[in-house]
Amino acid sequence: MQMELTAQRIKTHLEDLSKYTSTPGQGVTRFPFTKEARMASEYIMARMAEIGLKTYMDNSGSVIGRLEGQIPETVMIGSHLDSVRCGGAYDGIAGAVCGIEAVRAIVETGIKPYYSIEVVATNDEEGSRFKSGLFTGKVMDGQLSVDDIKRYRDEDGISVYDAMLEYGLDPDAIADNRRADVKAFIEVHIEQGPVLEAAKKDIGVVDVIVGIRRALVTVNGRADHIGTMPMNMRMDAVEAAAKVIANIGDRARKYPLAVATVGNLNVEPNILNIIPSKVTYSVDFRGTEQIHIDEQYQGMINDLDAVCSRFHMTYQIEETLNVAPVKLNDAFRSYIEESCHERGWSNMHIVSGAGHDAQVYGARMPAAMIFVPSVGGRSHCPEEYSEPRTLAMASATAFDTLLQICKEKQL
C-alpha cells in the first residue's frame, strides 16, 4: 500500500462526498432515503466498481461492494453513509472510504482471500431522520418488522416504510434480509473525541462500545392563562418536565463512564402568554455497563411518576433504541496492535462513547473498530476533521487485519 497515494485518494473522495448535502455551506446533512443519500451511494459504488468489486444496493439502502473469496462466508468492512444535521464530512463516510482502500490493497496483491470480503456503506446509522438508528445492522440481523418501520416517522410524518417505497426498496420484505453469511465485521471510524490527539497516538484500538438506550418522552399538561391560573392549580408541562430533566445529568454522574443527554426539546403551544400544555423531549443514556444504563432509565421513570402525580398530569415514553454495550473481539484487537507495531505506528486502547454499526454486528459475531484521531476532538459539526495521513494508516491497519483474519480461517 502506497501511503501517500492512499491518503490523497481518501482526501479527494471525502471532499467529493461532502458535496452531497442538503445544507451547503453549513456542514453535511445527508439523511437516509434522500436524493443526497442516492448521489453519495452512486459515488461510492463507482469507486467500488473501479477496483473490481461487484456492487449493489441492499434492501436497507446500504451499498455493498463484494470481492469473492475462496468460500462464500463473508467478512464485512465499512461504516455509515448518512450524517447528522449540519455535521462533518468524516463521521461514518471516512470509514466506508477507508474500507474501499483496504480492499483495494487486497485486490492489488492478486491474492484471492479465504473469506469473501464486502465493503459496506451502511444506511441510517445516526437515526437523525427517524429518531432510531443503526438501521442496516438491525436489518441484516433480522431485528426489524414491518410494524417497526411503519412506526418510526420523521418530523414530516413520513414513515421508514414509506421512505423505503419512495427510494425503490421493498419494505414488506424487511424481515427477510438477515445476513447469516456475514461472519465478522471491521469498522474504521474517526474517534469523535479528544483522547487520541491529546495522547499523541496514531491509532485507537477500541475495547468496548457503549450501550445506548434512547427514548422520546411526552409530558401532558393543560393550556391556561398565565396570569389568572394560580400556581397551586396549574398543570404546567414545562415545569414538570424541567424537574425530571434536572435529575438526569446528576444521576448519570454517579456512574463511571456513563453519560445522559436531553435534546430535541419541543414545547406546545410555545406561546408567550399560555401555560405549556405539552413538552416532548428526547433522552439518550449511555454507558459501558447495561445495569447502569437501565438504572438511569428507571430513575427517570420514577421521577416522571412522582412529578406527574403531584401535578395531576400524564406522560408517555416511546423507546426508540436499546442496544447493549459490546466488548470487541480480543483476537481482532491483537491483530490491530500487531499491525501498528510492525508499521511503527503508535496506538492505545480506547472506549467508544459513540454508538456504531459495529456494536450491532459485534453482538453476534467477532468485530473490531479502528479509531483515528479527531482534530480538536470535534465531531457532529462542520469543523470535524481527521488528517488523510492517519486515515491512510487506518486503511493499512484494516488491510493487515483482514489478511490476518483470512489467514486464521476460524470464524
Task: Briefly describe each language-model feature range.
Residues 2-34, 123, 380:
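N-terminal capping segment at the start of a domain
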Residues 10-23, 75-79, 346-397:
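Zn-dependent metallopeptidase/amidohydrolase metal-coordination segment
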Residues 22-68:
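A non-catalytic alpha/beta surface segment that caps or lines the substrate-entry region
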Residues 32, 261-270, 282-284, 288-289, ...:
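A short beta-alpha structural unit
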Residues 47, 51, 63-94:
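Catalytic-core environment of secreted peptidases
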Residues 85-156:
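A generic, well-ordered mixed alpha/beta core segment in the N-terminal half of proteins
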Residues 124-125, 131-291:
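Midchain, well-structured core segments that form catalytic/ion-binding scaffolds
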Residues 225, 229-254, 299, 372-411:
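His/Asp/Glu-rich mid-to-C-terminal helical/loop segments that flank catalytic regions of hydrolases
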